Each structure stands twice: as structure tokens, then as C-alpha cells.
């Protein structure tokens, strides 16, 4: 299925220029006010082509621009467009890939202020002024067909207004629509019969009109004849359509079997929990819609106000949605909602006053840059994916194994008089010292501050062989001299390289 695979955001709020690789399930991690929400707003604007306020344009002398590349576009999906639009947009889809660009310089919501273009594959240079064209009609229709719905759940929006009102622009309205669309299809005939019963009672052409309406018709006819002979007047109250009925839907709550009450009476935590419960419902009941289109779900801090157990439930729901027609992007401060499988592709966001919002290299990108052999890449990925805390830390301390992991946090607490999580320090155990250098280089590529804590044998078995230390280093030579001295005292044996080894006679370990 197709995916919004790459997004480039330019001149949008805190973002000067930012390029992101997206997946069907993409976590975004960063400090407060680093620009995570701005990324989501930019993607939402690109998909909905909605209003752009003045504060959304970083530099007023240039347009805000979002460029998105969609991969995996199937012929079947394009065939759902009308024939004219198929012919117009078809040449711009190469090997299932198509790139759109949305830009706007003046703030406002008018459609004429926005320009949506498509990348012309015949022009190789993307910086060429003709690389993106507005000529083919059907560009907006094609993008809307690929992503007909963008659901954006913000962290600090008014959940009361959102959940209590089912409007097409509200989160609850969009969620209810996703959940009820299959219901409408499944029960369409029953609903039509019920509406038909109402229509027969109150419409002007109803065959079972209520007596009071018939009386109104009679009196109206008598009076209208005096002014317009031959004219008949009937009271008409149209029955609601199926869409009218579902459009009015909202949610109410009851507690311990009491009467239903308005959602606004709940606390913020309960309100947020209900929003997330709707997401879980969507993952269970809203997946049977027969459509090749993908929907985009954007969530800020899905863990907000939730109990840790509820966070795990929500995580599973989001995973399930990402495998059933939804592309999910969320910003989080919680390691609980990110699994080991997600660490490699998690987007890490930072911000400076001069350059605005930027991203660090992901674990997967850094591994590929540092380690060229595929089999060794897998080993390094596994090592660094053992702790989701890595994504949230200011500093990492790489250690050789699990023994150090049990001991060092306790020592850190005693020495610093702080818990490791208070200082945003994370200890990452590796399976021995063999991957220490690669792991350190990967973290350096990611621009993550870190230290390596190793046993003494690392100096001889790894550091000297990898060129980190010279064999003639004075400290190395001093230690070898000590080894020889202790050997003469019968404390242990030495191997051919002058390093301690097990004493076979006394069975004393090195």
C-alpha cells in the first residue's frame, strides 16, 4: 500500500528546512518546544490544503513550502479517479512514486493563495524552475484520493469542545465518521426504512401524514385560493438523511450506572482517555472499510494523562491501525509507547535559536553510514535497540554487559546523589566489548553525547588492535610491567602477549 515516504518542510514556523523519512508507524521524540508539533502541523496542512495563518510562515519574504513523496501508488487506486484526471496525472507517477509540492506566501485560507504542483519526472534537476508543474488538472483530486483524511489530535486542544461536537473538522467528528461509515453500509436498508416512516408522516408527499398537518393543508388551501386560485399549499418537514443523522452524533458518559451526562463534566484526564479510547475503537471496528486510500493519523503526546497500562493498550491500537490502512505519526515523551522494533526509525528532533528545528540521524541511518557490511549492521542495530531510553537521554554510557548494568546505576546514584533518569543518563549494555567502537561511532554520528566504560582488557584486546592506543604507549607498558610482577608472585599466569590468563595449576582465574 502507498505511503507518504518522504517529506520536506521549508519556512514553516520554527522550521527553516527539514527533510524527514516517514514509515507507516513513525515516532517523533524531542525536547519541549523543539518543533515536533510544527512538523505535524506542516504535514496536516500539506494533506488538507487548509488555512495558513501568519505565524505559520517563518520568513514573510518567502513562501512556506511542503514537498511530499508518495511511494507504492497502485494502478488500481489511480483508476478510481475519473478518466480525465487519470490521463492528466498518470505521466507523473513513475514506478508507483509521485511527488507533490504545496506552497503559500501570503497568510489566509483562500484557495487562490495556495499552489499545489506535481514533480515532472522528465526534468532531472529538482532545483529547475520547471521541475514542478501546475499544468495537469487532477492534482488536488489525486492527492485527496491517496490521502482522503487527515486526523490530527493535538495535545492541548479543548477536548470538551472536540468530543462534544461532531463536526467534520473535529477529532471526534472524524473518528466517529471512521467508525460509523461501516455501520451505515451494513445497516443502510434498515436506516432507509426508518427514515421512510418519518418521511411518510411529515413530508408534503407523505402517504400517512399526521392529522395536524392535513388540517394545516386544508386551512392553507382555503386561504390561498382567495389570492391565487388553483394554487395548493402543503406543510413540508423533510426527513433527515443518513448523513444528517450520523453528523449529529457525539458521546455522553455515565458513571456506575447513573444517567447519561455531558462530556464536559469530566476531568481533563478522563476526556483525554476517551479520545484515546476512540482510537482503540477505531483499530477494532473501523478497519473494514473497503478502500485503497490511506488515512493519516497525527497525534501529539498520546500518552498524556494515561495510566502506564493504558499507554500499552493504546500502543497496540496504533500499531494495529498502521497495518490496516492508516499511516501513524506521533510525538511522545514516553518510552512506554515505543517498542524495540521502533527505535531504529524513530525521528529525533532538536532546535537552536539560529537554525530552528532540525533532526538528528536516526539509529538506522547512522548504522548504515558507519557499518557497510549488512550482517554487522544487524548486530549493531540489535545492540542499540535494547533500550528505548536511549531516545530520551541527554547522555548515554555504553557498558560491556548486564553485570555493569546492575552495578553502575547504583554507583551513579551514590556519587551524583541523583537517579540516572533525573540527569537524563542512560546505561546501554552491549554483548561484550566487540561492538563498543562501532556503537560509539554510531552515537557520535547521531550527535548523541556518550561515554564508553570498559574493562581493562579492552585496552589490549581491542584498543591496541584498532589503533586507539599504541602498543608502545607508556601506560600500556607500565601495566604490562605490573602484570609480569604479579605473575612472578604466583597470582596468575601470562599468555603469549603478556596478559593475565587462568592458572591451570591452582585453577585461579585471571
Predicted regions and their residues:
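Short glycine-/polar-rich loops that comprise or flank the Walker A/P-loop
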Residues: 61-66, 96-98, 146-150, 326, ...
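Switch/connector loops and helix/strand junctions flanking conserved nucleotide-binding motifs
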Residues: 74-80, 110-114, 160-164, 338-340, ...
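Glycine-rich phosphate-binding loops of NTPases
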Residues: 38, 74-196, 260, 373
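Switch/communication elements of ASCE P-loop NTPase nucleotide-binding domains
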Residues: 1-48, 246, 252-389, 405-406
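Extended helical coiled-coil dimerization/tether regions that scaffold
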Residues: 159-166, 174-299
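Short alpha-helical segments and helix-capping/turn motifs at coil-helix boundaries
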Residues: 48-53, 127-143, 234-237, 260, ...
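Flexible phosphate/Mg2+-sensing switch loops adjacent to catalytic phosphate-binding sites
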Residues: 48-68, 76-81, 284-292, 329, ...
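Acidic, divalent-metal-binding catalytic cores of TOPRIM
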Residues: 351-510
Amino acid at each position: 500500500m502507498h505511503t507518504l515516504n518522504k517529506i520536506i518542510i521549508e519556512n514553516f514556523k520554527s522550521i527553516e528546512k527539514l527533510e524527514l523519512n516517514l514509515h507507516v508507524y513513525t515516532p517523533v521524540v524531542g525536547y519541549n518546544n523543539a518543533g515536533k508539533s510544527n512538523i505535524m502541523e506542516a504535514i496536516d496542512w500539506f494533506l488538507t490544503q487548509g488555512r495558513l495563518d501568519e505565524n505559520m510562515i517563518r520568513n514573510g519574504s518567502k513562501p512556506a513550502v511542503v514537498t511530499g513523496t508518495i511511494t507504492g501508488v497502485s494502478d488500481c487506486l489511480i483508476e478510481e479517479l475519473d478518466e480525465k484526471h487519470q490521463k492528466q496525472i498518470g505521466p507523473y507517477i513513475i514506478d508507483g512514486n509521485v511527488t507533490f509540492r504545496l506552497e503559500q506566501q501570503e497568510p489566509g485560507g483562500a484557495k487562490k493563495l495556495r499552489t499545489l504542483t506535481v514533480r515532472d519526472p522528465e526534468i532531472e534537476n529538482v532545483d529547475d524552475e520547471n521541475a514542478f508543474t501546475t499544468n495537469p488538472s487532477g492534482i488536488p483530486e489525486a492527492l485527496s484520493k491517496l490521502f482522503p483524511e487527515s486526523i490530527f489530535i493535538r495535545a492541548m486542544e479543548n477536548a470538551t469542545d472536540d468530543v462534544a461536537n461532531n463536526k467534520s473538522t473535529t477529532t471526534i467528528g472524524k473518528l466517529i465518521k471512521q467508525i460509523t461509515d461501516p455501520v451505515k453500509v451494513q445497516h443502510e436498508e434498515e436506516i432507509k426504512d426508518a427514515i421512510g416512516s418519518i418521511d411518510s408522516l411529515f413530508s408534503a408527499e407523505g402517504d400517512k401524514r399526521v392529522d395536524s398537518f392535513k388540517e394545516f393543508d386544508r386551512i392553507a388551501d382555503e386561504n390561498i385560493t382567495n389570492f391565487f386560485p388553483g394554487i395548493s399549499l402543503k406543510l413540508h418537514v423533510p426527513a433527515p438523511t443518513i448523513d444528517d443523522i450520523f453528523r449529529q452524533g457525539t458521546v455522553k458518559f455515565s458513571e456506575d450506572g447513573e444517567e447519561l451526562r455531558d462530556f464536559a463534566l469530566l476531568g481533563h484526564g478522563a476526556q483525554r482517555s476517551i479520545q484515546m479510547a476512540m482510537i482503540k475503537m477505531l483499530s477494532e471496528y473501523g478497519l473494514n472499510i473497503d478502500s485503497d486510500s490511506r488515512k493519516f493519523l497525527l497525534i501529539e503526546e498520546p500518552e498524556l494523562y494515561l495510566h502506564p497500562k493504558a499507554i500499552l493498550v493504546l500502543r497496540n491500537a496504533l500499531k494495529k491501525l498502521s497495518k490496516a490502512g492508516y499511516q501513524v505519526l506521533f510525538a511522545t515523551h514516553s518510552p512506554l509507547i515505543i517498542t524495540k522494533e521502533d527505535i531504529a526509525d524513530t525521528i529525533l528532533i532538536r532546535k537552536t535559536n539560529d537554525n530552528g528545528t532540525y533532526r538528528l540521524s536516526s539509529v538506522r541511518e547512522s548504522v548504515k553510514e558507519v557499518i557497510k557490511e549488512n550482517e554487522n549492521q544487524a548486530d549493531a542495530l540489535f545492540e542499540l535497540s535494547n533500550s528505548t531510553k536511549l531516545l530520551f537521554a541527554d547522555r548515554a554510557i555504553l557498558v560491556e554487559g548486564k553485570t555493569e548494568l546492575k552495578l553502575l546505576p547504583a554507583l551513579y546514584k551514590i556519587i551524583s546523589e541523583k537517579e540516572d533518569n533525573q540527569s537524563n543518563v542512560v546505561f546501554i549494555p552491549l554483548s561484550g566489548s566487540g561492538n563498543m567502537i562501532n556503537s560509539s561511532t554510531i552515537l557520535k554520528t547521531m550527535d548523541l553525547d556518550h561515554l564508553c566504560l570498559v574493562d581493562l582488557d579492552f585496552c589490549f584486546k581491542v584498543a591496541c588492535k584498532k589503533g586507539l592506543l599504541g602498543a608502545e604507549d607508556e601506560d600500556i607498558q607500565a601495566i604490562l610491567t605490573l602484570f609480569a610482577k604479579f605473575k612472578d608472585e604466583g597470582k596468575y599466569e601470562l599468555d603469549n602477549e603478556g596478559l593475565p590468563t587462568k592458572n591451570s595449576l591452582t585453577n585461579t582465574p585471571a
